[in-house]
Amino acid sequence: MGKLFEEKTIKTEQIFSGRVVKLQVDDVELPNGQTSKREIVRHPGAVAVIAITNENKIVMVEQYRKPLEKSIVEIPAGKLEKGEDPRVTALRELEEETGYECEQMEWLISFATSPGFADEIIHLYVAKGLSKKENAAGLDEDEFVDLIELTLDEALQYIKEKRIYDSKTVIAVQYLQLQEALKHK
């Protein structure tokens, strides 16, 4: 398949450059020779952390998400800084958003969030051996979160209630559910 469906970029026009994303419009030549436009969101990428306490609870944060106009419960996450190793970002975001540090930070998977219009890749990690860090780095000045620790069953209920509503957190909870099911095989 690959190259058979490839689109050739003819022209790129940057429309907006902000603190988090850049927006561009590409003129492309389609495989059939026709031309079209593609609106693209450029994002530096992000990390997300499935943090598991010694009591086997999932550490999450509740925060207001303006695009959704509501608060949702999510796993800790944050944007990659230019040139930064995703593992370093994961360790930093875990500490900043939750006050926890960990003994083990293991990469799980990387995935595209919305490949139809954005190039954002999230690197998902699992953190274990958590302990509260004294004098932990705080939240960014524009972040306001509440810390929540949930059992797997509680997290599944939050998904049903749409309190957990974002893809990275749903993927994280489903991963934990799969791990639990595999234990009992």
UniProtKB/Swiss-Prot annotation:
GO biological process: nucleoside phosphate metabolic process; ribose phosphate metabolic process
Superkingdom assignment: Bacteria
Name of a matching Pfam family: NUDIX
Keyword Transmembrane: no
SUPFAM superfamilies associated with the record: Nudix
InterPro entries: NDP_pyrophosphatase, NUDIX_hydrolase-like_dom_sf, NUDIX_hydrolase_CS, NUDIX_hydrolase_dom
E.C. code: 3.-.-.-
Single GO molecular function: hydrolase activity, acting on acid anhydrides, in phosphorus-containing anhydrides
Required cofactor(s): Mg(2+)
Top EC category: hydrolase
Listed GO CC annotations: cytosol
Keywords of this entry: Hydrolase
Recorded family membership: Belongs to the Nudix hydrolase family.
Function: Involved in the activation of the NAD-dependent methanol dehydrogenase (MDH). MDH activation by Act involves hydrolytic removal of the nicotinamide mononucleotide (NMN) moiety of the NAD cofactor, changing its ping-pong type of reaction mechanism into a ternary complex reaction mechanism. It requires the presence of magnesium ions and is also able to use ADP-ribose.
Subunit structure: Homodimer.
Protein name: Methanol dehydrogenase activator
Biological source species: Bacillus methanolicus
Gene symbol of the encoding locus: act
